[in-house]
Design a protein with these regions (language model features):
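Bacterial extracytoplasmic/cell-wall-associated proteins, especially those involved in peptidoglycan
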Residues: 1-144
Length: 144
């Protein structure tokens, strides 16, 4: 939530959280939230690829840049959040995550949306979806 929507309103952050949950609750996507977030093509790190004797469990796989479901995961930038103690948006995002995960809150805010994009891009997949909401800088869609 923080990585995808920290510059959005609370409603915008909730909407992003609901997309993740809507996917986790739909058999077309993985059932675990983390698996939904990390879904996408990967490649093996050159460090482990050069060693043919490694076990599969010892190999390191990385997301292909700009090819995953949630852009922050594969943008190539560090994922560390600086100064979480004084970061209000971080605290809000964590509170929203708790409410959505623990209590399945705000279920109708994006009417079952399972896709979204920033309003400054126009991905081709949007043409095959039903537009359900516009919240802040994001446009939300439902794939039937």
């Amino acid at each position: 939530i923080y990585r995808e929507a920290n510059n959005q309103s609370i409603a915008g952050m909730i909407a992003v959280a609901r997309v993740v949950m809507n996917r986790a609750q739909d058999r077309r996507w993985p059932a675990k939230v983390c698996d939904v977030i990390y879904e996408g093509p990967v490649y093996e790190s050159w460090k482990t690829k050069k060693n043919p004797d490694l076990k599969d469990s010892e190999r390191v796989y990385l997301p292909k840049k700009n090819r995953c479901q949630f852009s922050w995961y594969c943008d190539g930038k560090a994922d560390e959040v600086i100064n979480t103690e004084n970061n209000i948006q971080w605290k809000v995002a964590n509170s929203i995550a708790y409410e959505v995960l623990a209590f399945d809150r705000w279920n109708g805010i994006v009417e079952g949306a399972n896709h979204y994009h920033a309003d400054y891009v126009q991905p081709d997949w949007r043409k095959r979806m039903q537009l359900v909401a516009r919240i802040d800088d994001h446009i939300f869609y439902r794939m039937e």
